[in-house]
């Protein structure tokens, strides 16, 4: 099974402009994500998909594989689909470009054991605090007994009316798709649920497509604000001092 990771990266961000190129210990944030994913033994190639000439230039300078996509890609999944048109793989793994300390072993967990019957998968992690549950940037998810997604929401789901004894989950920005799944997404218009929640994955759910949810123990450290960036910089500096990270 040939698995290729693609990191969608756009320069414009509603919360942190130019985020992929912001420096962390002398390297762009996107470089750190790329290097972490490259450590995976089950990923054959890692690519960046972007519409930014500045990001493309950085990738060339740092010998990172890069594909240019159109400037009007409405979603990261659409950008992934565009890049996949010229990149051969059995499974395409989408990795968010704003988690510079992402664990490569966690990324591997989204890969299927076999291709037969596989369509798409998404990692999810337990929510550990009420603040996480009510934060609309954390997309909550519930799954059926077979592990397929039932619904995604920016609101806490399910609502704890009958009991408080429930482990809530949030989706992580690591997904795996077959070419069939990406083609379906690219050629299917948004449904009303996706429009109101602004969650890409609902496009599969609304049309009854299987999206396997895989629970992992991971505390994601995504960079969405200047405060997040400062925190990650401190963590990277500490890991460099301890020899847990190496700049090459």
Model-derived features with residue positions:
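Hydrophobic/aromatic residues located in beta-strands of well-ordered beta-sheets
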Residues: 5, 46-48, 92, 121, ...
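Short phosphate-binding loop-to-helix
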Residues: 47, 53-112
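A residue-level structural signature of the nucleotidyltransferase/glycosyltransferase Rossmann-like core
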Residues: 4, 47, 99, 140, ...
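Short, high-confidence coil segments that cap the C-terminus of an alpha-helix
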Residues: 43, 89, 116-119
